[in-house]
């Protein structure tokens, strides 16, 4: 895996990309995720929560694009390590540290 985005600059949300970005997703997309989970809890009909699900997807894809623009090399290195080691955080701490230094959690 050479990049976390395709040729047009759109994020490719693979498991390695999502795992590497999980802390950032949790921070930035919390309101959208909470609204979606509340909707799912209150109404078991999946159709009722599609708009909230789209909000979560939009937030995550926007975040991934922002992260890739801000810290492309570090993100690609971290994602590549996670991909190579099947999402084992312990084996990618060096890449994680470099990624979080350039793209800190806010």
UniProtKB/Swiss-Prot annotation:
Complex I is composed of at least 49 different subunits. GO terms for biological process: mitochondrial electron transport, NADH to ubiquinone. This is NADH dehydrogenase [ubiquinone] 1 alpha subcomplex subunit 8-B. A motif (Cx10C motif) lies at residues 92-103. The lineage of its organism: Eukaryota, Viridiplantae, Streptophyta, Embryophyta, Tracheophyta. Keywords: Acetylation, Disulfide bond, Electron transport, Mitochondrion, Repeat, Respiratory chain, Transport. Disulfide bonds join 29-59, 39-49, 71-103, 81-92. InterPro entries: CHCH (IPR010625), NDUFA8 (IPR016680). A motif (Cx9C motif 3) lies at residues 71-81. GO terms for cellular component: mitochondrial intermembrane space; mitochondrion; plastid. A motif (Cx9C motif 1) lies at residues 29-39. Pfam families: CHCH (PF06747). The keyword Disulfide bond applies. A motif (Cx9C motif 2) lies at residues 49-59. Accessory subunit of the mitochondrial membrane respiratory chain NADH dehydrogenase (Complex I), that is believed not to be involved in catalysis. Complex I functions in the transfer of electrons from NADH to the respiratory chain. The immediate electron acceptor for the enzyme is believed to be ubiquinone. It is found in: Mitochondrion; Mitochondrion intermembrane space. Residues 26-67, 68-106 form the CHCH domain. The modification N-acetylserine is found at residue 2. Belongs to the complex I NDUFA8 subunit family. Contains four C-X9-C motifs that are predicted to form a helix-coil-helix structure, permitting the formation of intramolecular disulfide bonds. It comes from Arabidopsis thaliana. Its main location: mitochondrion.
């Amino acid at each position: 895996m050479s990049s976390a985005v395709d040729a047009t600059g759109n994020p490719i949300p693979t498991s390695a990309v999502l795992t590497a970005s999980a802390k950032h997703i949790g921070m930035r997309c919390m309101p959208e995720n909470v609204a979606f989970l509340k909707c799912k809890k209150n109404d078991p009909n999946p159709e009722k929560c599609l708009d909230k699900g789209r909000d979560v997807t939009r937030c995550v894809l926007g975040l991934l694009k922002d992260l890739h623009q801000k810290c492309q090399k570090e993100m690609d290195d971290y994602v590549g390590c996670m991909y190579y080691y099947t999402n084992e955080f312990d084996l990618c701490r060096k890449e994680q540290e470099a990624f979080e230094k350039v793209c800190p959690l806010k």
